[in-house]
């Protein structure tokens, strides 16, 4: 039988148990930090030469020169033709739905003119070049290409550079096909911290980017953290999470499989069921034990459920909402009768899946909203990846003579108060005598 925590929100010591459940070690440690810093320094100083060495060492792929790291566009198109029609159709439908959704996120420039003629506004522009990291090998995820590339392209980013490791020369056709569909401009066979370094600093072959996005292992996550400041990054993602709040009226098999959909990602993933119905909680537990045996990732799921899973019984809806907002889950399912009525009370969640028919997996692939979401309680202060992550804002100010006269007097007084005489003088030069 699966050994999952069964908790009552009213029990003594519940808060301590909850904190232990949610605790997650940082994405890095001293050993990883040292390795990553060495890789970053090496790539920054030696460029393509270092990339070729690391590719041979870690991916067992020997290439003669830097230009061999690039996968030609013709290969992307060939991969698109090679994959089965149902996969191609699925990728294209997913890309279109993600595009349709993200087009509604585009920020627009705006401005207004005050009575004295002073012009104020905000100009929105896109990033020039973005780097997309995609995990490679047999565990490659073409959905990651779609979710990261489409918002960048919708934002208007003119150049999107993708890096994907190809261990032993193994290329994942679905990943390359997704890159072709999404309009990725250049693809390099690079992985690990060295790929992040190449994107951040540039080499003779790989152009430097303005922002690095995309998931990766502990070395990739640590490298992204290290290069932040030189370039922007999307986020440092922790293990995948799902919290299902159910009123007891949904098929327990559905809920069990929804919990497994995140647990199968890796052994550190977290799956939590919150319900007011203790009998239903037990039904879900029985379903979990029945269904886990049917899945090829049974071992991973069992470890994740044992180490970080929980079934939590609450007294009422208000207690459930308080718990949800405290946990701030990456994925939240509201498997209840009137989920929309609960929305005003839900403050912290990466994505909210409403109703009994909305499996979280639909959001992972093709619903439309982005599947790159804040984890480890960071939904308290951060948001899903979107078009706005590939746009930036510039403030616009143009003073009329009359406006400069009025504002100059105010700025002069404030600058004097801060002891900044050059500021005060600069403002007052524009003041009429």
UniProtKB/Swiss-Prot annotation:
PANTHER family linked to this entry: HISTIDINE BIOSYNTHESIS TRIFUNCTIONAL PROTEIN (PTHR21256:SF2), HISTIDINOL DEHYDROGENASE HDH (PTHR21256)
The protein, known as: Histidinol dehydrogenase
EC number, UniProt record: 1.1.1.23
Details of cofactor binding: Binds 1 zinc ion per subunit.
Chain positions recorded as Zn(2+) binding sites: 262, 265, 364, 423
Function statement: Catalyzes the sequential NAD-dependent oxidations of L-histidinol to L-histidinaldehyde and then to L-histidine.
Gene behind this protein: hisD
Cofactor(s) in the UniProt record: Zn(2+)
Pfam families, A to Z: Histidinol_dh
Recorded GO CC terms: cytosol
Residues reported to bind substrate: 240, 262, 265, 331, 364, 418, 423
NCBIfam families: hisD
InterPro entries: Ald_DH/histidinol_DH, Histidinol_DH_CS, Histidinol_DH_monofunct, Hstdl_DH
